[in-house]
Amino acid sequence: MLVDADVLAREVVEPGTPGLAAVVDRFGEEVLTDGRLDRPRLGALVFSDAEARRDLERIVHPAVRARAAELERQASPDAVVVHVIPLLVETGQADDFDVLVVVDLDPETQLARLMARNGLDREQAQARVAAQAGRAERTAVADHVLDNSGTPEELAAQVARLWPVLAART
């Protein structure tokens, strides 16, 4: 079973959710477009104001954790549950899991991919990266580190080699 914190972070602020209501209470109606969260607009606010980012995290992170716990409870007892948590270190969850695999890449590649994927300029991408734990912090908590500087196929090959090692632990 795969539990992806980024997917859950979107889910907990869908229209009609308590999460979206809390975001609107804090940031105002201007973060909405047609009743839905305007992520680029909210991103511009929170990545230029550390206190605003912390406020958003205080709203979203507990809701994501609760939803992740709910999904894990629904898994079969013999299921291997894989959590994808981009902000694992920042949210203090590194000790909550049996094994930690960090997918790592060099900072320049990280910036380039973030700019391409999200349509950000360099300054916006740097602000987002600066809000995250550093590379050394992430790799320090890892049991295994995968190199994501290559192609998706190369990363998939690393995962395929690691999976039997992880599966043997269950």
At which residue positions do the language-model features occur?
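ATP-dependent small-molecule kinase phosphotransfer cores
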Residues: 7-80
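Short, well-structured alpha-helical segments
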Residues: 39, 57, 122-130
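Switch II (G3) loop of P-loop NTPases
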Residues: 78-90
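Short beta->alpha linker loops
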Residues: 37, 59-60, 105, 130-133, ...
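Short, acidic/turn-prone active-site loops that include or flank metal/cofactor-
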Residues: 7-10, 106-108, 127-130, 152
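N-terminal polybasic phosphate/anion-binding patch
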Residues: 1-15, 25, 29, 131-140, ...
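NTP-dependent small-molecule kinase module
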Residues: 70-80, 94-103, 107-112, 116-120, ...
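Residue-level signal for inorganic ion chemistry
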Residues: 6, 56, 82, 125, ...
